[in-house]
């Protein structure tokens, strides 16, 4: 039988009925009969009269709030966190226990649509739903996991060469404010989702509504939206919503992996906002804060999300996660806790972005589990190491150059500095999603071409070309054409 879902949470009530005892912001205490206490994580619903709420909808007299049980606090009371604004909620209001956790629609019907944390559609009034899954689910068992390791080619030189991504792995994009995390994650959607052949799921966790709107319109124009599911819990949402929206998106992705037997790309922007929401909820529940004011359950909450993002027999979820680094401090507990779960970490650097080099990836701080000859081959590994050695030597010489000047270096070091500066510039690349702003077309550089170009750079074959020729270019053909134009101008 097909159920129709519009913008209301499923109302199948199998639990008890209680009454609101206290409301403090998004925290709601509810009293139930002793034999009807709901379980932890159960969804509760309560109707709010629009006459007492600031939010009015034409033609409707009530709206339904969804709460999630977080604690049993004694005296037949439970403490719940609201996933929507609680304005208009009053003491004594009837609260119904749904008897189950929050659930979201799954399946092909979700493709091409935008949802909130409750699985309500935001782009259309209603969709026909045949199946819903709860957002709280166990991670796959050990014997279900897939051990195969395969590289995911992106066509972005700095990533493919120095921090190669794993198909079915977890990828982290670390960076402070304004260094290009969201642009890079949108570029990954553009490059990988178009050629991927599977399904893409995007979770907007606590980020700007404008960015979500731009992403939806861009995907619609490019045609990618038909194989994409978007789930949003933005900056203006209560912390309970922002804490659960990642799980809602992941649940939809798991259905495609486990039931439809498809490979899935999961994009999460931003994991830090997930942690931040957990910290807010923890404080609201009165828990003792841990390091730097974060919740004591930080590692547990992160593990519950990350361990579900994995490959099972023959099919995978590949996740790309943007991680905001507060005050550019990579040792902050939020990014630090995320590190342990990732297969590849791409660190975006402010000093590099200040030079105008984009993507502003720090080639020395970024790492990958598969940067190993066993997975990527001897030639790729050797060239990547050569590039890193030259860049590290250039970094070591920075203080000497700043104090004495480049003329005081030995001839050998001068050659290394020249190559390092060319490498730095050649690691820049025009992005497809930035074409409208830069006026320059994006470029896709095959891995073999990237390896060959950097091998020639490291061995000195390109020392005769000017540094400017390497800036924001694709392959070597672009560099040589640009060098020719520069020579003609001079």
Swiss-Prot record:
Record's keyword annotation contains Nucleotide-binding? yes
May I have one GO cellular component term? proton-transporting ATP synthase complex
Q: Top enzyme class of this protein?
A: translocase
Keywords associated with the record: ATP synthesis, ATP-binding, Cell membrane, CF(1), Hydrogen ion transport, Ion transport, Membrane, Nucleotide-binding, Translocase, Transport
Q: Which GO terms describe its molecular function?
A: ATP binding; ATP hydrolysis activity; proton-transporting ATP synthase activity, rotational mechanism
Q: Which SUPFAM superfamilies match?
A: C-terminal domain of alpha and beta subunits of F1 ATP synthase, N-terminal domain of alpha and beta subunits of F1 ATP synthase, P-loop containing nucleoside triphosphate hydrolases
Q: How does it sit in the membrane?
A: Peripheral membrane protein
E.C. number, please?
7.1.2.2
Q: Which family does it belong to?
A: Belongs to the ATPase alpha/beta chains family.
Q: Please report the name of this protein according to its UniProt entry.
A: ATP synthase subunit beta
What lineage is on file? Answer: Bacteria, Bacillati, Actinomycetota, Actinomycetes, Acidothermales
């Amino acid at each position: 039988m097909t159920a129709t879902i519009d913008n209301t949470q499923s109302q199948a009530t199998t639990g008890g009925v209680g009454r609101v005892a206290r409301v403090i912001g998004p925290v709601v205490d509810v009293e139930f009969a002793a034999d009807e206490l709901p379980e932890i994580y159960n969804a509760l619903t309560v109707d709010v009269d629009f006459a007492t709420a600031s939010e009015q909808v034409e033609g409707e007299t009530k709206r339904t709030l969804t709460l999630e049980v977080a604690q049993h606090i004694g005296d037949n009371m439970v403490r719940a966190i609201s996933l929507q604004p609680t304005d208009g909620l009053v003491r004594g209001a009837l609260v119904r226990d749904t008897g189950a956790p929050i659930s979201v629609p799954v399946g092909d019907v979700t493709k091409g649509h935008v949802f909130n944390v409750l699985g309500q559609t935001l782009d259309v009034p209603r969709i026909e739903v045949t199946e819903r899954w709860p957002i709280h689910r166990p991670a796959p068992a050990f014997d279900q996991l897939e051990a195969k390791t395969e590289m995911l080619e992106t066509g972005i030189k700095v990533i493919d060469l120095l921090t190669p991504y794993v198909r079915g792995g977890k990828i982290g994009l670390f960076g402070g404010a304004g260094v290009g995390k969201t642009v890079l994650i949108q570029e990954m959607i553009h490059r990988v989702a178009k050629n991927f052949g599977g399904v893409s799921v995007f979770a907007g966790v606590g980020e700007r509504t404008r960015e979500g709107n731009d992403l939806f319109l861009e995907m619609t124009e490019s045609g990618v939206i038909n194989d994409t599911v978007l789930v949003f819990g933005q900056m203006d949402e209560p912390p309970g919503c922002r804490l659960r929206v990642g799980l809602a998106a992941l649940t939809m992705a798991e259905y495609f992996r486990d039931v439809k037997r498809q490979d899935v790309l999961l994009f999460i922007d931003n994991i830090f906002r997930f942690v931040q929401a957990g910290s807010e909820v923890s404080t609201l529940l009165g828990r003792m804060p841990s390091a730097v004011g974060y919740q004591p359950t930080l590692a547990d909450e992160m593990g519950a999300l990350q361990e579900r993002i994995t490959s099972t027999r023959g099919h995978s979820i590949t996740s790309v996660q943007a991680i905001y680094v507060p005050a550019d401090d990579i040792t902050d507990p939020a990014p630090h806790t995320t590190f342990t779960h990732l297969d590849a970490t791409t660190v975006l650097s402010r000093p590099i972005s200040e030079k105008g080099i984009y993507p502003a990836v720090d080639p020395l701080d970024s790492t990958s589990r598969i940067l190993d000859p066993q997975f990527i081959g001897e030639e790729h590994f050797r060239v990547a190491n050569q590039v890193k050695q030259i860049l590290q030597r250039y970094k070591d010489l920075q203080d000497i150059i700043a104090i004495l000047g480049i003329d005081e270096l030995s001839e050998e070091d001068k050659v290394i500095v020249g190559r390092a500066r060319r490498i730095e510039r050649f690691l820049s690349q025009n992005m497809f999603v930035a074409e409208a702003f830069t006026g320059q077309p994006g470029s896709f550089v095959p891995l073999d071409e990237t390896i060959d170009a950097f091998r020639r750079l490291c061995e000195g074959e390109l020392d005769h070309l000017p540094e400017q020729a390497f800036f924001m270019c694709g392959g070597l053909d672009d560099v040589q054409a640009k060098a020719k134009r520069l020579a003609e101008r001079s």
